[in-house]
Regions:
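Short, cationic-aromatic polyanion-contact patches
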Residues: 3-14, 28, 55-75
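Alpha-helix C-caps/helix-loop-beta hinges
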Residues: 24, 49-53
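Short amphipathic alpha-helical interaction segments
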Residues: 38-49
Length: 75
């Protein structure tokens, strides 16, 4: 799947998480939950899906960021 196809299939909640992650690299799950007004379990589920699809990556200190490939659209 390319970036356009992935974004077309995202829920509103996932698009919200992705949007916040674009503006705040290296963000925690709790910070995402607060910024998006989405429950922590829902954010965890969305992030796990993003990790499986290689849209996001987990840093050493439990912070998450979008992968450079996804950000650049060269997925």
């Amino acid at each position: 799947m390319n970036v356009k196809q992935i974004r077309e299939n995202m829920t509103e909640a996932a698009l919200s998480v992705e949007s916040v992650m674009r503006g705040h690299p290296r963000i925690t799950l709790q910070e995402l939950s607060t910024a998006c007004s989405i429950s922590l379990p829902a954010v965890e589920f969305i992030i796990e899906q993003m990790l499986c699809m290689r849209v996001a990556q987990r840093g050493a200190f439990g912070r998450y960021t979008l992968t450079p490939e996804y950000q650049n659209g060269s997925f």
